[in-house]
Amino acid sequence: MAKSDYYEILGVSRDAEEREIKKAYKRQAMKFHPDRNRGNAEAEAKFKEIKEAYEVLTDAQKRAAYDQYGHAAFEQGGMGGGGASGADFSDIFGDVFGDIFGGGRRQRVSRGADLRYNMELSLEEAVRGVTREIRIPTLEECDVCHGSGAKPGTSAVTCPTCHGQGQVQMRQGFFAIQQTCPTCQGQGKIIKDPCTKCHGHGRVEKSKTLSVKIPAGVDTGDRIRLSGEGEVGEHGAAAGDLYVQVQVCKHPIFEREENNLYCEVPINFAMAALGGEIEVPTLDGRVKLKVPAETQTGKLFRMRGKGVKSVRGGSQGDLLCRVVVETPVKLNERQKQLLRELEESFGGPSGDQNSPRSKSFLDGVKKFFDDLTR
């Protein structure tokens, strides 16, 4: 069966620079890597093609030979154990591929996966801090084989294919290319008698309960990292981390903007005109707020230090109260008559002295129409 063109495999032009080839390789490798396509033979074969194409096209000597002779330049190949002769491409794989999948030179042991837990908090809990118990599903070390994957009384043995190196060498013409051992998958060892509980994986599915301390001042989008509380690694490798993602629920009174809190405070029009004192809510309880005479809707009153303390310590935000002047409703006849008398005392709906904003607005409207008729 004819082999595919290396340039077509990576999806690059024949005059592509090495930087473009590396970028294309990364993209393709992530898509078809065996760790992401377990049990998919077609993806595994595709990945081998991608890897082979990358190895040739990023080596100047190999690429020149391929451009001139095609695949014929690398015929007459064979496979052997990992040795010292020939070109060693492990460093290239480490640079380009290791950062993505954690691959390494020689034996490969995978660190445990990180876990994420979404936690909803009330505004009060986020502001003051709280300790919560959470239960999470995870992978933990098998208590029968203690993570080895082997049946008690036995142990893993050196891989007969790679002799414990985790890699084998493929010879193609006068070149030698190293790749992950297909027998042990890079581990360097194989398990002949697997543990009956974990079936050779060294890990089992469990749930665990953790106590999580949430610091005061957190907000939506913040993450708390619990080191080593993720899934345990394969065959004794380091465990991953647990990330607690914070989501603060909407509050019926307060809105938060960074470390400041905002709330709307309704007052009647008499207090707005004459001034007075009202009680406003804070997260620490009720406090008195003095409202000066002639206060308008939208006026902001700042109460310093009544907001949220910074999660990093030090500064504390403020509470900003926005006044909303309410129009009275369901008036009786006596109240309506009093309002009519009040309006008359103003000299009409747009009394110059008592309603400066109304007068300014009406003057502007008059000027607008005067300009239109000129």
UniProtKB/Swiss-Prot annotation:
The answer, when asked if Cell wall biogenesis/degradation is one of the entry's keywords, is no
Quick one: a GO biological-process term for this protein? response to heat
Q: Where does Zn(2+) 2 bind?
A: C159, C162, C181, C184
Which segments does the record annotate as CR-type zinc fingers? 129-207
| GO cellular component terms listed in the entry, alphabetical order | cytoplasm
Supply the InterPro entries for this chain: DnaJ, DnaJ_C, DnaJ_domain, DnaJ_domain_CS, HSP40/DnaJ_pept-bd, HSP_DnaJ_Cys-rich_dom, HSP_DnaJ_Cys-rich_dom_sf, J_dom_sf
Every J domain range: 5-70
Report the cofactor remark.
Answer: Binds 2 Zn(2+) ions per monomer.
| Molecular-function annotations in GO | ATP binding; heat shock protein binding; unfolded protein binding; zinc ion binding
Q: Required cofactors, per record?
A: Zn(2+)
According to the record, where are the CXXCXGXG motif repeats? Answer: 142-149, 159-166, 181-188, 195-202
Q: Which HAMAP family match?
A: DnaJ
- Family to which the UniProt record says this protein belongs: Belongs to the DnaJ family.
Q: How does it assemble?
A: Homodimer.
Kindly provide the name given to this protein in its UniProt entry. Answer: Chaperone protein DnaJ
- The organism is Sodalis glossinidius (strain morsitans)
Q: Give the gene that encodes this protein.
A: dnaJ
